[in-house]
C-alpha cells in the first residue's frame, strides 16, 4: 500500500520520488498525546486528528532526530517535526479559501454579465415581433405550476423563425394544463397580443435557453424578448396587450436554464423576459466529445505507473534492509572477503598445530605411566603446563 505524506504542502509519496533521494515515512505518536500536540502545532493543524494509517515523511525532520543503524533510518522517540512550508503557502493551498475565492469570482462574473445585458438593451434599437398565445384550461393555478422550455431549432431560410413552447404543468399531475406558444419573426412589424384569462393573476417569469447536454455555448448574436402585459379592471375577463422587444448582443454565455416565478399580483403589470439564440449563433466545439479515448489513455498510464511503483518499492525495500552502504565499490567488498578467507585459513592451521601438540603430550604421559617414572610432583608440573597452554590457546 503506497504511503503519502500528511502535511498540507508536501506531495511526497513512496514510489514516485527520486531514486537518488531516499524517503522514509513515520507514523504519528498517537499514544503520546503531548508529543502529538507538538507535531500538530508545528503542522498548524491543531484541530485535526490523524489516524494510524497516516504518516509524515523524513523531509520534515532534522538530521538530529533520525538514528541510522545498519543503513536504516529510525526516528527517535523524542523527535518532533519542525521543517514545514510558510503559512502563506498554506493559506494559498487551503481548500476552504479556494472555494470562497471561486464563489467571489462567480458573483463578479454574474454582475458583469448583468451590466453587459443592460447596456445592450439601452444601446440597441428594438425590433417588434408578433406573438400569438392561447391559454386553454380554466382556473389554472400558477402557484402549483412549473415552466418547461424547449429551445428552438434554427432553419436555413431567408426568414428566420424561432419558436418557443412553454408548457405549464401542475405539480402531482402528468397532463399539461396550459400551453403557451410564441413565434418570433425577424421581419419588422408591430405585434399584438390578446389572451383570455379567467380569474388568473399576473406573473413575472425570466427564462434563458441553454444546450440540453449541459455544454456551454458562446452566443455571438442573441435575441432578447421582453413581454409586458397590462391588466384591465374587469375581474372575470382580462385582455393583455403585449409588446415584444428584441436586441442583438455581443458574445454572451448562457450556462443554465433559470425559471423563476417572482410575483403574483392582479393590480401590477407582469413581465416575461425570454432569451432566444438566433441562427447565427455558433456553438463552440468543446473538449467533452473525445472523453472515452482520454479515459482509456489515463487508465493505461495509471497501470504503467502502478507497475513502476511496485518495482521501485521492491528496490527501496532491498536498499533499506541491506547491511552495507550503497556507496561502497564491489572491488573493495571483494578485497574484504579475500582477507576474511585468509584469516580463516590461518586459524585452521593453528588449530591443527595445537591438536598435534596435545596428542604428543598425551602420548608422553602414557609412556611415563607405563615406566612408573611419574611422581606426584611431576604430575602437578604437567597439569600446570596443560592449564597454561589451554589458557593461551583460548
UniProtKB/Swiss-Prot annotation:
Which intervals of the chain are annotated as region Disordered? Answer: 86-109
Motif placement: HCFC1-binding motif (HBM): 320-323
Quote the PROSITE patterns the UniProt record gives: ZF_THAP (PS50950)
The residue ranges crossing the membrane are none
Disulphide bonds annotated for this chain are none
The stretch of residues making up the signal peptide is none
Q: Which UniProt keywords apply?
A: Cell cycle, Coiled coil, DNA-binding, Metal-binding, Nucleus, Repressor, Transcription, Transcription regulation, Zinc, Zinc-finger
Its post-translational modification remark reads:
Cleaved by HTRA2 during apoptosis.
| This protein's record includes keyword Transcription regulation | yes
* Any one GO biological process: negative regulation of cell cycle
Matching entries from InterPro entries are given as: THAP_domain_protein, THAP_Znf
> What is one cellular component GO term in this UniProt entry?
nucleus
Which Gene Ontology molecular function entries are recorded, alphabetically?
DNA binding; zinc ion binding
Q: Which positions are tagged coiled coil?
A: 347-381
Q: Where are the zinc fingers (THAP-type)?
A: 1-84
Cell compartment(s), UniProt: Nucleus
Task: Supply the Pfam families for this chain.
Answer: THAP
What is the recorded function of this protein according to its Swiss-Prot or TrEMBL entry?
A: Has sequence-specific DNA-binding activity and can function as transcriptional repressor (in vitro). May be a regulator of cell cycle: THAP5 overexpression in human cell lines causes cell cycle arrest at G2/M phase.
Subunit text: Interacts with HTRA2; under apoptotic conditions. Interacts with ABRAXAS2.
Protein name as catalogued: THAP domain-containing protein 5
Organism field? Bos taurus (Bovine)
State which gene encodes it: THAP5
Amino acid at each position: 500500500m503506497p504511503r503519502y505524506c500528511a502535511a498540507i504542502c508536501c506531495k511526497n509519496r513512496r514510489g514516485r520520488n527520486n531514486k537518488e533521494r531516499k524517503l522514509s515515512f513515520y507514523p504519528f505518536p498517537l499514544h503520546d498525546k503531548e508529543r502529538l500536540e507538538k507535531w500538530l502545532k508545528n503542522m498548524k493543524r491543531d484541530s485535526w486528528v490523524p489516524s494510524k494509517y497516516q504518516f509524515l515523511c523524513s523531509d520534515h525532520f532534522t538530521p538530529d532526530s533520525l538514528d541510522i543503524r545498519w543503513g536504516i533510518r529510525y526516528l527517535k522517540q523524542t523527535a518532533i517535526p519542525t521543517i514545514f512550508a510558510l503559512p502563506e503557502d498554506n493559506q494559498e493551498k487551503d481548500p476552504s479559501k479556494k472555494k470562497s475565492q471561486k464563489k467571489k469570482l462567480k458573483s463578479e462574473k454574474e454582475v458583469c454579465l448583468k451590466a453587459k445585458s443592460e447596456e445592450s438593451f439601452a444601446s440597441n434599437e428594438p425590433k417588434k415581433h408578433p406573438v400569438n398565445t392561447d391559454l386553454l384550461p380554466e382556473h389554472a393555478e400558477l402557484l402549483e405550476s412549473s415552466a418547461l422550455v424547449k429551445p428552438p431549432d434554427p432553419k436555413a431560410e431567408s426568414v428566420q423563425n424561432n419558436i418557443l413552447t412553454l408548457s405549464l404543468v401542475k405539480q402531482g399531475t402528468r397532463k399539461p394544463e396550459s400551453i403557451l406558444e410564441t413565434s418570433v419573426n425577424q421581419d419588422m412589424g408591430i405585434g399584438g397580443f390578446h389572451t383570455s384569462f379567467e380569474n388568473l393573476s399576473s406573473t413575472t417569469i425570466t427564462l434563458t435557453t441553454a444546450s440540453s447536454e449541459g455544454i456551454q455555448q458562446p452566443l455571438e448574436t442573441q435575441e432578447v424578448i421582453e413581454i409586458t402585459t397590462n391588466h384591465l379592471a374587469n375581474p372575470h375577463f382580462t385582455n393583455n396587450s403585449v409588446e415584444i422587444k428584441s436586441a442583438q448582443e455581443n458574445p454572451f454565455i448562457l450556462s443554465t436554464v433559470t425559471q423563476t416565478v417572482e410575483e403574483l399580483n392582479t393590480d401590477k403589470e407582469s413581465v416575461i423576459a425570454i432569451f432566444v439564440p438566433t441562427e447565427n449563433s455558433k456553438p463552440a466545439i468543446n473538449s467533452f466529445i473525445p472523453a472515452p479515448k482520454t479515459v482509456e489513455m489515463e487508465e493505461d498510464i495509471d497501470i504503467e505507473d502502478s507497475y513502476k511503483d511496485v518495482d521501485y518499492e521492491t528496490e527501496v525495500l532491498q536498499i533499506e534492509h541491506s547491511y552495507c552502504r550503497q556507496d561502497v565499490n564491489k572491488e573493495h567488498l571483494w578485497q574484504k572477503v579475500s582477507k576474511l578467507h585468509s584469516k580463516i585459513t590461518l586459524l585452521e592451521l593453528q588449530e591443527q598445530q595445537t591438536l598435534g601438540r596435545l596428542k604428543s603430550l598425551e602420548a608422553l604421559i602414557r609412556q611415563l605411566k607405563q615406566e612408573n617414572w611419574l611422581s606426584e610432583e611431576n604430575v602437578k608440573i604437567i597439569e600446570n603446563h596443560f592449564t597454561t597452554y589451554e589458557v593461551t590457546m583460548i
